Amino acid sequence: MPRANEIKKGMVLNYNGKLLIVKNIDIQSPSARGAATLYKMRFSDVRTGLKVEERFKGDDIVDTVTLTRRFVDFSYVDGNEYVFMDKEDYTPYTFTKEQIEEELQFIPEGGMPDMQVLTWDGQLLALELPQTVDLEIIETAPGIKGASASSRTKPATMSTGLVIQVPEYLTTGEKIRIHIEECRYMGRAD
């Protein structure tokens, strides 16, 4: 079984009799000598959908669950439900808006490549996105000429409604690459 410092976002733990999907990990390094690094993990309970927060020391042993991953394409929206289709056998997977609220900020209209659903024992658990996504800026302050040498940033609204900080020289209509896990600008899209 892995230690807490080996856990990554998207993994599923069996903790206190609950299946918990790791949504976010904050690493807190203590300044005192000999103190253990703390891992504050935010989870979503698979069965109830409730958010759970737990702290672990880096060398704590945790029980992980092996999941089945299937590549999917976004298919359609039906009211409050989002339907994704398996790329191999065309099995539909349905999520409610609440289940994938965070992920929806990064999914452009028409979907994106390399999305996966995670299942365990035939039970649908989560939607996993690739590391990066290319989105179009639909609203930001006008670009400043000669600002490329500056490291100052400004807020920009993407086509999905996501707001992130981008360099000052970018303008409305440009496509940029965003790192999904860190929710940060990486560069212009190809």
Swiss-Prot record:
At the top level, the lineage of the source is Bacteria
Annotated S-S bridges = none
| InterPro entries associated with the record | Elong-fact-P_C (IPR015365), NA-bd_OB-fold (IPR012340), Rib_uL2_dom2 (IPR014722), Transl_elong_fac_P/YeiP (IPR020599), Transl_elong_KOW-like (IPR013185), Transl_elong_p-like_YeiP (IPR011897), Transl_elong_P/YeiP_cen (IPR001059), Transl_elong_P/YeiP_CS (IPR013852)
- Family statement drawn from the similarity comment of this UniProt entry: Belongs to the elongation factor P family.
The family database entries (SUPFAM superfamilies) matched by this protein are listed as:
Nucleic acid-binding proteins, Translation proteins SH3-like domain
What HAMAP family is this protein classified in? Answer: EFP
SMART domains for the chain? EFP, Elong-fact-P_C
List the molecular function annotations (GO) for this entry.
translation elongation factor activity
Q: Biological process GO annotation list?
A: peptide biosynthetic process
Q: What is this protein called?
A: Elongation factor P-like protein
Q: What are its GO cellular component terms?
A: cytosol
